[in-house]
Amino acid sequence: MARTCAETKLVSDTYDIDGHDPCDAPAGPECLPLDGWHRARGGRMVEFAGYWMPVQYEGIIAEHLWTREHAGLFDVSHMGQLVLSGDGLDAAVEALLPIDLATLKPGQQRYSLLLDEDGGILDDLMVQRWEDHLYMVVNGATKWDDIGHLREHLPDEITLSHLDEHALLALQGPEAAKVLARHVSGGLSLDALTFMRCAMV
């Protein structure tokens, strides 16, 4: 079901057609979970991968340079966040990804590919292990095809949940760790978050 954002106002006059909110159109793009937050702060919204996305605030060049020198936060909630669980999970998912999940420990993640029946590449993705389930992030442009492929080829014992109401943020730049450190608690050490490691915060 499409998420509407009737209470927000489209910021960019480039995409504001006759003052109507495009997110109310049933066949149009959907809104991200943080849509209202972006619009209230002047985000310029453009259509991408079936969603209204904040492409910039004050200016692309300034934001690019700031991220290169400091850190920038990007809303990538259009990407597919999936949770998989059930008996025989590793073997079932390994039939679709060319990696060994048995060696993937909790708090670790791997880059992999989603394959078709002939071994052809459908998409690239990230997969993490959390206790008894896997968390997977697939690309936004191919998300629905990926979900359909997974549901078609995974056995009935495997549950696939699409976290479409959860935001996904990417913190990037040389000062990203310093920025993140101000927002974590519970004794989490960022020193332990080396390449391909992850943690709940």
Give residue spans per PLM region.
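Basic, glycine/lysine-rich polyanion-binding surfaces/domains
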Residues: 1-201
